[in-house]
Amino acid sequence: MADRALFHSPVPPAPDLEVEVSRGFLADADEHLAGLLVETPWTQGEITVFGQRRPIPRLEAWYGDPGCTYTYSGRLLEPLPWTERLADLRDRCADAADTAFDSVLVNRYRTGDDAVGWHSDDEPELGQRPVIASLSLGATRRFRLRRRDRSHDPVVLDLEHGDLLVMRGPTQALWEHCLTRTARPVGERVNLTFRWIVNPFPTGGGG
């Protein structure tokens, strides 16, 4: 099990919501934020909205073990090889969450206009009850969760520099989450969501 002493920040109880937060988990967050901003080969993907291609409102990069392709929003991401920095952060988050990770989606929110809409990390390659470890670096942003059937009030968390949030169990099946836009002047935020790809394609493979 995860180290309960790490996850001391209470999350409002809600049905089938298995979320825990470790405030200030990453003591050397400043160093890693600065490094990721300059080392990461950021790209801005596109999605189709009402038949039109539009850029997503954030920058991103996908890293992972060989064969860990990831499909979301109609896009297929091929993994970049682990860097020394990301492998270290992966191992630290895996130890805290007491689970293994083989991939990470790195998102860069440049201003308060960058965001991600309501969604669940429920793609088939993540399995039925995925564990997602979300590491926040940089500006504090508001993270919201809501039940898909709207049977419970939304849960709102302000995620700060160095915080680690872990979602597990039925959370992805029954809840959605988002990072909303804000009109407040905020600095840059980098978020790393570590996950495990079930049955990744072998090296050089695809489908």
Regions found by a protein language model. Give the residues of each.
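Non-heme Fe(II) oxygenase metal-center motifs and adjacent flexible, charged/small-residue loops
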Residues: M1-G207
